[in-house]
Each structure stands twice: as structure tokens, then as C-alpha cells.
Amino acid sequence: MELSHETCNGIKNDRNGGTSSLGLCTGTDPLNWTVAADSLKGSHLDEVKRMIDEYRRPVVKLGGESLTIGQVTAIAAHDSGVKVELAEAARAGVKASSDWVMDSMMKGTDSYGVTTGFGATSHRRTKQGGALQKELIRFLNSGIFGNGTESSHTLPHSATRAAMLVRVNTLLQGYSGIRFEILETITKFLNHNITPCLPLRGTITASGDLVPLSYIAGLLTGRPNSKAVGSNGQVLNPTEAFNLAGVTSGFFELQPKEGLALVNGTAVGSGLAATVLFEANILAIMSEVLSAIFAEVMNGKPEFTDHLTHKLKHHPGQIEAAAIMEHILDGSSYVKAAQKLHETDPLQKPKQDRYALRTSPQWLGPQIEVIRAATKMIEREINSVNDNPLIDVSRNKALHGGNFQGTPIGVSMDNTRLAIASIGKLMFAQFSELVNDFYNNGLPSNLTGGRNPSLDYGFKGAEIAMASYCSELQFLANPVTNHVQSAEQHNQDVNSLGLNSSRKTAEAVDILKLMSSTFLVALCQAIDLRHLEENLKNTVKNTVSQVAKRVLTMGVNGELHPSRFCEKDLIKVVDREYVFAYIDDPCSASSPLMQKLRQVLVDHALDNGDREKNSTTSIFQKIGAFEDELKTLLPKEVEIARTELESGNAAIPNRIKECRSYPLYKIVREDIGTSLLTGEKVRSPGEEFDKVFTAMCEGKLIDPMLECLKEWNGAPLPICQN
């Protein structure tokens, strides 16, 4: 997006009262608070949708002030096919600042990094401006890559591409004193998928990301130690990189200030932060949807999403989280079935659901607000000018300041990481309830799906893995920015550690993806187990009813027998008893089903009075025949029901198809190709988790997730008066 107003430098700026799409300072809002607040208008979900839309556009047009998180992430993914175009309107402003530097050199103007040394040794002076820039790049090439046999010390190429894009965007604003041709060359590298190799560590993101950015400059100047990676993963030297990018002008001889312009910025930290926040925002929405599915499979009570509760708390993140969950649960077949169960048997489960379900909006809401605020902070940062000095052509001066201080990156990434850890903690609590038969309202222990629970331990290993993920995530929640060390002869005595914090947040996002993938597979397992439960319960009810009619209705001489009145109470037992508590051996003498069915018959016999003394009217004497007939019939019917379900011919269809959460279930089961996990199958849980994790990393879960919410109008349901 290009802006219509001009600065005194001849480039776009908001100083004269214009308005940037991302809210840069304007004449009517000199402190930028109003536009910062305005940027948070609307729902978080709508913002994420816009982010995804920007990610999917085929071209990123750089003008200096309108770069977005989604665009950075698109370019970071080298296989996305998205191309970068530079706004031609920026050329004049870039040239003006470059010309000013050369003119000032000719006039003998003393400028930091142009005629002086660097940092704590800026008292030194030189007239060899080009040689000074060459030395700057040489001494900053201080990173370590290692041999790669055990571990990689190279910055991920996606982060490097993000940094290249952000740095070009910054330099386009025309305050940096660099030739436009250098920016065009970096853009050609991006468009030809040629990525310089940058060290993973070695920056404190103040004065900018000096060390890693110097390796981009090293490639541009043809330093022999510089390397790049091509589109097919091949390692390239500078000559090969230039040839593949179609740059025929040869390596650059840096002019005064150009080396400093390339390295004195926060682009590596902010570029990685942008890609991290793209993922974090999507994972935040995913956590809301998964919490709603968790409520469905746990037979949760949906009143925890009622708008009045959240309206009275006032926090927008909480209100939106509750509204999203409310939307998914509204009309859910699981919710309807659970409500019926709660009405007929109110004592079967606690009056209130546990905190991991009932307070999930209150827990997730603040995390969403933190992630959203961090997103806005980073979006401002990737559109900021971070050099020192800044070239102000309009006032004919170089401004010496500290925009290279990447504190917005360090702070926003620390905050984001804490939010991610909190989301992971909730997810682990929900997962722990889901696999525990003491809490999960009738699902089998460990979500075992097989016939023999003694040889099927379901998600037990997964719960251990989830505990490990969660523990590491909680450790990563510790801040990075409170570990600042004074650097560079105490000139850089406070520094942001922006890239370090971004790297740790990228790790946290990756771990939350592991947790989300595992949890999603577990939820799909629970959905299928509820389907199995419903079909098995229906089979048991029909079989008990059939046996009761056959054995208890008539006496030996064909007369009506007093035991015929037992059937209704026998069916109540089946309705109230958790199927998975007995279904592996339903007719065992110690089975809770058989014990309670027998107790019904005993109770009726005790009420039968004197008729128990007569063998033709005794209910006690019917118990043996009833149990024998049930033992003959029930195991066979249970196996038939299981087999029919496994073959896709279940008597009762899966309720999930009637729910708004179905798109996520569908992609996991049908498109990704997972299925009910049982001990009888060779396939391990980890194999299924891996499939979903890979799909999540490839962005394949985004559309199904949004499909769950496609009918949401962005508002809570009206507060009902009944």
C-alpha cells in the first residue's frame, strides 16, 4: 500500500498530518496512542483472517510503512511462491539520503559511522569512508556456524528471509543513506530463493542485529567467507549467488554509511518475531476451538460461555473467547445429549465442570490480548526506521539516536512466550482430564479404544509426552530480557536481546504445536469413543430389553409373571452405567453392569412379598435364567456392534457430523488419514501425532479451523431471559 503524502526527504511519511495504514505518527496524533488503540478495533478472529489473507497474496509490495505480519511470514516460507516488489515511488527518497551522505563526505561533515569509528571507539576519525564500511563488515563477521554434524548454528533460512524483507522495508523509507540498487539486489535474492547463511547466535539486538546482518552485507560485497543456500538447498558462494539471482553488475563496493545501513537495524529479531506471531495468533484461535471440542466430548455444561458472565468481567479477550466457544457449542449434538443426561440424572457428575473447562475463556482471554498487543508492537517495529544515524535531508543533518534498540521485540516476545506457555498449561490440564476416567465422564481410562484394556494403554505415553512438553514450555516462559549483559566496552550497556527472545518464542510456538497436535488427535479419539459408547449402550439396552421380555415376561405355564415389571428399571441401569466400565467383559460376575442388574431383580423380588414362596411367581428364581440368557447373547451382540462400527456401518451415526467442530475432525480423520487408536493395531500414537503435526506446520489446519467459525457473526449470543 502506498501513501499519498510526501516528507521533506521526498519519501512517504506521516509527519505532515497523513495517516499510515499501520498507524505511524500523524500531526493529529503526535504520540501515536490513538492509532495504536484504533488498530485493536474489531475482533481478534477477524484480524487473524486478515493476516491469513495477506499471507496468501501472490505479491508483497514494499513501500516502507505498510508491511504486515502475514506478508513477512509469506516471504519467510521460501516455497510459497510469493514475490517481492519495491515501490518505485521510494527510489527518489532513498537516492536523496544516499546523495546526502556522499555530499557530506565531500564537504568534510563529521558523521558517526561515516567518518568516525564505531561504538565506544567513535572518537577515531577517517576520510576513507568506503574502507571503513568494509572493515565494519569484516569485524562484525564474528559468528560461528560449526560443521553441522551434531547441531546447526545457522539461523533458519525462514528467519533470514524475514530479516531481508524487513531490512529492505526499513531502508526504503529513505533515512539510511544507501543506494536503491542494493535494495533491488536483496529483493532479487528473495525472489530467486537465494538465502545468505547467518549465524544463529551472536546478536544482542542493540545496536541492532549487527553480527547476523553483517553476513548479508558480506554476500553483497563478495566476502570469501560468505555463503548462501539456493532454492534446491545447494550451498552457493557469492559469485554463484549473484549469477543465480541474475545480478550482473558484480559485487558492491560499499560507499560511506552503506555498511552501517545494512547492519544497524533490528530486522533479524523483528522478522523472526513476525513469523512467530503469525503462528501464535493462529494457535490462540485453535486453543479456543479445541477448548470447545473438549467441552463437547466431556459432556460439559455450556453455561460457562453465557455472555452475561463475561460481559460483567469486561475483558475483550475473555468475551471473544467465550463467544467463540459459545458459537461452537450452540446447537451441538453433544451438548444436547449432555443436557438430556444432566436432566435425567443430575447426580451423575458434579454440578460444575472443573476449571480447565469452566474457566477456559477467563484463562485464554488475557493470553489473546497479550498476543494481539505484541502483534501490533512488532508490526510497528517492522515498519520502523532503526538506523543510527538517521539522515534527515530536509534539515540537512544526521541525527544520532538509538532506534536500533530492539526493546519492543524483546518485551513483546517475552510476553508472547508467557502467553503461549499459559495456553499450553491449559491444554495439558484439559488433556489430563480427558485421559483420566475419574474425570472424563464415562470415557475409558487412557482413551483406550480396543477390546481388551489389559492389552491397550491408549494415550498413556502421550500424557507423559504432554507433561514433558508442558514442563519445557513453562521453563521457556521465563523472560530473556532480564539477562542483559553490558557489551562493547560498556557502550552497549543496555541492550534488548530481541533476537534471543524471538528464538526462544519460536521454540515455544513449536512446542505448543506439538501439544496442539497431540491434543487434537486425543479429542478425535474421544469423539470416536463417544460414538462407540453410544452404539454399545444402544446394543446393551436392546439386548437387556430383549432378554427381559424373553425370560421375565411369562411364567412356566404361559401366564404373565411378576418379573415383567423389572424391564424398565433394568434399562435405567444400562442408561446410568458408564459403558466402558464393563464392556470389555460385560457378563462377568464382578461386572458393575451385572451386579446392578442383579440388584434390580433382587429389589423387585423383595417387593414381591408372599409370591416369592411360590416357584411359579418367584422373581428370585428368574435371576439365574435371566443372567444365563444375557451371558449367551450379550457378548455376541457387543462384538457385532463393534464390528459394524469399525466397518462404517454403525447403527447410530457419529454425532460429530452435526456439530460446528466437524471440519477439524474431518481433516484429521479423512484428509490426514488417522483413525481410532487401539492396542490391537500396530500403528503407534506417535505416528498419528506426527501426521497432524506436519499438517499443522504446513498450514493445512487453518481452513478447517476457520470453517468451524464461518457462521459466527463476531458477537456473543443474546442473553436469554428464560
Curated annotation (Swiss-Prot):
Cross-link (5-imidazolinone (Ala-Gly)): 206-208
Substrates-to-products reaction catalysed: L-phenylalanine = (E)-cinnamate + NH4(+)
Active site residues according to the UniProt entry: 112
PTM comment: Contains an active site 4-methylidene-imidazol-5-one (MIO), which is formed autocatalytically by cyclization and dehydration of residues Ala-Ser-Gly.
EC number in record: 4.3.1.24
UniProt modified residues of type 2,3-didehydroalanine (Ser): 207
Compartments where located: Cytoplasm
Residues involved in (E)-cinnamate binding: 264, 352, 358, 388, 460, 488, 491
Any Pfam family matching the protein: Lyase_aromatic
GO biological process: cinnamic acid biosynthetic process; L-phenylalanine catabolic process
GO MF terms, alphabetically ordered: phenylalanine ammonia-lyase activity
Keyword list, A-Z: Cytoplasm, Lyase, Phenylalanine catabolism, Phenylpropanoid metabolism
Keyword Zinc-finger carried by entry: no
Highest taxon of the lineage: Eukaryota
PANTHER family: HISTIDINE AMMONIA-LYASE (PTHR10362)
General function of this protein: This is a key enzyme of plant metabolism catalyzing the first reaction in the biosynthesis from L-phenylalanine of a wide variety of natural products based on the phenylpropane skeleton.
Family to which the UniProt record says this protein belongs: Belongs to the PAL/histidase family.
Protein name: Phenylalanine ammonia-lyase
Species this protein is from: Citrus limon
Organism phylogeny: Eukaryota, Viridiplantae, Streptophyta, Embryophyta, Tracheophyta
Name of the gene this protein is made from: PAL6
